[in-house]
Amino acid sequence: DYRMIGSSVNLILGQRLVRVLCTHCKQSHPLTDAERKIISTVLATHPAPPVLTKESVLYDAAGCDHCNHTGFKGRQGVFEAVRVDAAVEEAVIRDPRENIILEAAKAQGIPSMAEDGIEKVLSGTTSLTELQRVVDLSSGRHTLTTEDDAASADDFLSHVV
């Protein structure tokens, strides 16, 4: 019974694995306008965004003997979490759709998976291309943007058979 989830779960955690750039051969380059736009869009909703300067650089995979000419060596997780507090518990019981739960959790100030990934891109851990391969960066955190996305007055329970 999905209504018991809210009272029995403490934390919801999502993860994706990105390949880690090889420290021996990764190559830096200044941000392009397109890269800066993608990063700025994602960071716009970040609760404590890293500073993006004119001198900020990104790194790309190159390939060498250490990484078997792939440009990557190892994997690391990008994460997002939702603490199940009273607001999230109520959302899970009322309407357990992802966008409703994330909207209820927004006040927690926990970075989204895209935001965590961008932090790893800016630190040189992985490349923007690699992050885009595993995480949808087109919208940052899923948020309600129109009335059509909001739950109806009847809520989810009225549609359960």
Q: Could you describe each region identified by the protein language model?
A:
Residues D1-V161:
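Short, flexible helix-loop junctions that flank or precede catalytic/ligand sites
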